[in-house]
């Protein structure tokens, strides 16, 4: 269990509690979680973070009424900047989006502006929102993570408790390599409910070569680990930077959706540009 799982900042969350579903607009349903909760134990300070990045959200269950009462549907794309004070708690995000269902808006841009304003207020940071009509996305191919998949290794694993021990002495030689490694075996659990979170992860780096067996064992050790998606990605970035000391590093995870939302955080210390096309399990 994470050291901050019982922190008072989490006590008021609706996550893990019985809730009413409201279908008229209510911005107060949104709840934020301080990023400092997981950054402080990692020694990460807001004014000197070793990375930049965003939390990319896809909103699949977004609907409202137009001015004449006709329902509208869209797919939303939200990017929340890494410098925001809070991350957005996903169940509260779902409840908030449900509150649009029977609410009239004059036009699509009013919906977009409302989302941007409310999410920015909750996160206390920069948020961008784009809305897409369904025909704009129809026929879009399933994406994939570029890189070498490290999953098909003939190894025995019997430990699923999180540990950084696998990253000790995980690099070898003095030769500098530049490679992209991919795993689809990332599984962690919600910090509050302990429900499973399934994801694929892409690790791009330049530096001494990382032992792929040790890296895979490290990633599999998240299997019983309880943390939010964004926190796991920052932990992985921080651990790789600390133990493997690459010159350049980017970590990008795309998680399967829950409640009509998927969360796709990335962190990088270079000019990494994430792909935004959904993966096969999304």
UniProtKB/Swiss-Prot annotation:
This is NADPH-dependent 7-cyano-7-deazaguanine reductase. Its main location: cytoplasm. Pathway: tRNA modification; tRNA-queuosine biosynthesis. The active site is at 190 (thioimide intermediate), 197 (proton donor). The keyword Oxidoreductase applies. It is found in: Cytoplasm. Catalyzes the NADPH-dependent reduction of 7-cyano-7-deazaguanine (preQ0) to 7-aminomethyl-7-deazaguanine (preQ1). It comes from Escherichia coli O6:H1 (strain CFT073 / ATCC 700928 / UPEC). Substrate binds at residues 88-90, 229-230.
């Amino acid at each position: 269990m994470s050291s901050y799982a019982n922190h008072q900042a989490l006590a008021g969350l609706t996550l893990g509690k019985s809730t009413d579903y409201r279908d008229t607009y209510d911005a107060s349903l949104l709840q934020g979680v301080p990023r400092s909760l997981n950054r402080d134990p990692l020694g990460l300070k807001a004014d000197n973070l070793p990375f930049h990045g965003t939390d990319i959200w896809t909103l699949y269950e977004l609907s409202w009424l137009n001015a004449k009462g006709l329902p509208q549907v869209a797919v939303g794309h939200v990017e929340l900047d890494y410098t925001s004070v809070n991350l957005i708690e996903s169940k509260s995000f779902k409840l908030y989006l449900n509150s649009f269902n029977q609410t009239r808006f004059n036009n699509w841009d009013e919906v977009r502006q409302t989302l941007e304003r409310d999410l920015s207020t909750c996160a206390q940071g920069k948020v961008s929102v784009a809305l897409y009509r369904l025909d704009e996305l129809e026929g879009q191919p399933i994406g994939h993570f570029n890189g070498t998949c490290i999953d098909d290794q003939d190894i025995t694993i019997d430990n699923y408790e999180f540990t950084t021990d696998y990253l000790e002495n995980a690099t070898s030689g003095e030769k500098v390599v530049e490679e992209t490694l991919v795993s689809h075996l990332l599984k962690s659990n919600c910090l509050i409910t302990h429900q499973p979170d399934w994801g694929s992860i892409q690790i791009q780096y330049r530096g001494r070569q990382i032992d792929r067996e040790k890296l895979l064992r490290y990633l599999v050790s998240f299997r019983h680990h309880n943390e939010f998606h964004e926190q796991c990605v920052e932990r992985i970035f921080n651990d790789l930077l600390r133990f493997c000391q690459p010159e350049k590093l980017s970590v990008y995870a795309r998680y399967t959706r829950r409640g009509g939302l998927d969360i796709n955080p990335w962190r990088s210390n270079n000019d990494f540009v994430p792909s935004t096309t959904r993966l096969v399990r999304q």
